[in-house]
Amino acid sequence: MSQRYRGRFAPSPTGPLHLGSLVTALASWLDARAHGGDWLVRIEDIDYPRCVRDADNDILRTLDALGLHPDEPPVWQSRREGLYAEALRQLDAAGYLYPCGCTRKEIADSLVHVRERHQTLGYPGTCRNGLHGKLPRAWRVRVPDGPAATICFDDRWQGRQCQNLETELGDFVLRRADGLWAYQLAVVVDDAAQGITHIVRGADLLDSTPRQIHLEHLLGLPTPDYLHVPVVVNAVGEKLSKQSGAQALDASAPLDALRTAGTHLGIVNQETTVAAWLATATGQWLERLRAVQDLRGTPPSSAATGRLGA
């Protein structure tokens, strides 16, 4: 891409920053700094019931203590709902949306093989051609049929990734039955509005990426480069998260936290101050990426493919 690098860290304020989220924050910060780019912070707080009071400010204070300073003031998704409404209107006007009256139980009952990915049940298309007497609950976006349903992209860490949206997922929700905006729509709209060129995040979001690329295509938005770092897991192999009991970072020991997070990314140095550690780690980052890409045969930048359905 010819434009200036712009990256971001986009935490959900469901609790304090922990090691797993720090690994993602650090990776995105290092990638931005190593490329001479800008690094932004966006608070993804549209799922109001899951948000914890003042967790957003706690996250920002912790990032500041760790020396991870954004280049622009943070933004909050809850203050940007007009952008999501306009994107939904645009998709609806183009004929890509339809109302859905199905409950999660009805969807599960209609599937022969129930499959759940990130708490999203595969959708069999029950309401694609009409509500059949049901009341509208949510808004879904159509996915392409046939060969066009396969979306592929080259991830700078994980390598080539492909997903068939039709067979693996189905038409997916953009506005939920409770009136809240779906993550997939909000993140695509915000990344475009903020001019994000490179997305660095955890590998647990790998299978969200084809959905986001599909939405980027439908909305006529640019597709960023993607890099998904391995997630940190606990002693039983579960992703380290607030839900799995991850401990809050100790902001009074920032160097220890950075060293631990760096180790998970393959970044190790012996610097004794936060500023010096981050400066050295920035130089090490591109070497680490080259080593990963050489091992996986991954190209240095990603290219997304996939055609729009008729």
UniProtKB/Swiss-Prot annotation:
Motif 'KMSKS' region: chain residues: 239-243
EC number of the protein: 6.1.1.-
Chain positions recorded as Zn(2+) binding sites: C100, C102, Y123, C127
Binding positions for L-glutamate per the UniProt entry: R8, F9, A10, P11, S12, E44, Y183, R201
CC cofactor: Zn(2+)
Motif 'HIGH' region positions after renumbering to this chain: 11-21
Binding-site list for ATP: K242
GO molecular function terms attached to this record: ATP binding; glutamate-tRNA ligase activity; zinc ion binding
Function of the molecule: Catalyzes the tRNA-independent activation of glutamate in presence of ATP and the subsequent transfer of glutamate onto a tRNA(Asp). Glutamate is transferred on the 2-amino-5-(4,5-dihydroxy-2-cyclopenten-1-yl) moiety of the queuosine in the wobble position of the QUC anticodon.
Family per similarity comment: Belongs to the class-I aminoacyl-tRNA synthetase family. GluQ subfamily.
Protein's recorded name: Glutamyl-Q tRNA(Asp) synthetase
Gene: gluQ
